Amino acid sequence: MRGVVWNGKIDVTEDLEARAPGTNEVRVRIAAAGVCHSDVSVIDGTIPFPTPLVMGHEGAGVVEEVGSSVTKVKPGDHVVLVTLGHCGQCDACESGFPTHCRDTFGKTSQPFTYKGEPAFMFANTSVFAEHTVVKESQAVVIDPAVPLAAASLIGCGVLTGAGAVWNRAKVGRGDTVAVFGVGGIGLNAVQAAWIAGAVRIVAVDANAAKESLARDFGATDFVDARATDAVAAIKEILPDGVDHSFECVGHPAVLRQAIDILGWGGNCVIIGVPPPATEASFRVAALTHIDRGILGSRYGSARPHVDVPIVIDLYRQGRFKLDELVTRTYPLDEVETVFSDMAEGKVARGVLIP
C-alpha cells in the first residue's frame, strides 16, 4: 500500500503494509487525513519519535475488518480516528478522563512493515497511509452523510482546540477570551468559545491575513502580533483583561503574553507544544495577587465518544464549521507541499487524500 514514512527524510512509498487487526483492533481504509503542526514537529525533532515512522495522526475512513472481540464498530462504518488508545478499564477511564489513562502516553507499536522491516506508528494512528490498524476505542462511528475530509479534522485539531475551551477552561456565557495563534487548533478554540457564549473573543496572530478567517469563525476582534504589542492591544479592547486565554503557539514568549493579559481570576490554558525541555518564566505575584491560574490541556481533555458526537451534531445544525477548515485537499505525493503551505500560513488545514 501507499503511505508517507519519515526515516530521516520524507518517503512517499508503495513499499508499506499494515497487518491484520488483533482481537480488540480494527483495520481502517483511510479516506482523508488532516495535516497538523504536530506532524511537522516529528520532522524537526520537537516531538522525538523512533523511526522508521508512518506519519499522520488526524484522519477518518471506513472500517474494513475488525478483531474477534470488537463489538462497537463493524465493517462499512464511517469512523473518526482519535489518538487516545485508552484502555477503558483503569480508574481514569472509568471516571471519564481518558486523557489521564496511562496507556495513552509514551508507548510505541509497530503494526506496519516498511521495505520488509517493522515500522513505528505515530500517535497511535498513522493516517498518512491507505490503511491503518487502531484499537476499537480509537474508532468513533459517525453519520456516513458527513464528508470524510471534514470529519478527518475532528480527531486532533477540533478535539484539541474545542475541548480546551469546553472541557478544560469551561468557558461560559458572557466570558471574555483571547486565543493566541489561529491556525487549525486556534480556529477551533475560537469557534468553540463562540458556541459557548463568550461575549468577546480576541484572536491574536502574527499573520494579518488570518483576520478574515478568524472573524468568520467567531472572533470579535483581531490583533496583529507582528505589528503591535499584543498585550497592550488587547488591554485597549478589554482594559480589565480576559477571563480565559489560550496559548496555541508553543512559544514561551507567547505564553507570557497569554498570562499577562488575564483579568482577575482568569485562567491561561496551554495548548501549544514546544520542545520537551522548554522552560517558561512568569512573575509569581501575577498569579497569586489576583487569583490567576495556568492549566495544561492534553488533547482538549477530550472524551472522544462523547465529544465527537457533540461536534457532529453541532456541524449538522450548521453551528460548527468543519468544511470551512479544509482549505485544500492534496494527494499523498504532495505532502511536502502541504507542509510548505502550512508554514506560509496559506491553509487553515490541508487534507491529504491517500
List the predicted regions and their residue ranges.
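Mid-domain Rossmann-like dinucleotide-binding core that forms the NAD(H)/NADP(H) cofactor-binding site
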Residues: 130, 137-138, 143-228, 232
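C-terminal hydrophobic helical "lid"/dimerization subdomain
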Residues: 1, 240, 256-260, 305-354
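Cysteine-cluster motifs in flexible loop/terminal segments that predominantly coordinate metals
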Residues: 82-137
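Conserved beta-strand positions in the Rossmann-like core of class I SAM-dependent methyltransferases
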Residues: 64, 201-202, 269
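A short acidic, Gly/Pro-enriched loop at the edge of an enzyme's catalytic core
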Residues: 233-243
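Glycine-rich phosphate-binding loop and adjacent beta-alpha segment
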Residues: 251-319, 354
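Glycine-rich beta-strand-centered segment in the early N-terminal region that forms part
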Residues: 19-33, 43-94, 99, 138-146
